[in-house]
Regions:
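Core segments of cupin and vicinal oxygen chelate
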Residues: 20-64
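Histidine-centered active-site/metal-ligand motif
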Residues: 16, 56-59, 80, 112
Length: 154
């Protein structure tokens, strides 16, 4: 379907993200037990599907070769996947404590004004972000704020 005004597609939402991993047996417990995603299906021994909310799946992990090289940091491609965990700074503090207690190396903690975030790699180096939204819709008044990023002390 297209949007009748411009001929462009009428995108109605983001369906899912598929991440390549070297070892499903290592990655599945991370996404299920550390991140708390609901494991909802498998495609043989090559893919595992997870749901964040009530969708059939939001994230899938695709097994690649165990010796596959990671993409260079400056290569085109997906930079990170962001998962909303709440709306309060206290929820973000609790998330940081949980991640650290589970051996996750935090790479950075940022205040984006519109949201506050913790970034960290999954077992294969895919960068993930957990975030809480700012209660105020400040970006409606100043769209430049969407691109703001400064260090956040938690």
């Amino acid at each position: 379907m297209t949007d009748n005004r411009s001929g462009a597609l009428n995108v109605q939402g983001l369906g899912h993200v598929v991440l390549k991993v070297r070892d499903l047996k290592r990655s599945v417990p991370f996404y299920r037990d550390v991140l708390g995603l609901k494991e909802v299906g498998h495609f043989g021994d090559r893919m595992v599907f997870f749901s964040v909310v009530d969708n059939h799946h939001d994230i899938a992990l695709l097994q690649t070769r165990e010796d596959a090289a990671a993409a260079p940091v400056d290569a085109p491609g997906l930079a990170h996947v962001a998962l909303k965990i709440g709306d309060s700074l206290e929820e973000l503090r609790q998330a940081r404590a949980w991640l650290e207690a589970n051996g996750v190396a935090i790479s950075r903690v940022r205040d984006h004004i519109v949201s506050r975030s913790i970034y960290f790699p999954d077992p294969d180096g895919n960068e993930l972000e957990v975030f809480v939204d700012n209660e105020e819709k400040v970006w409606l008044e100043d769209p430049e704020l969407v691109a703001t990023s400064k260090e956040l002390a938690l």
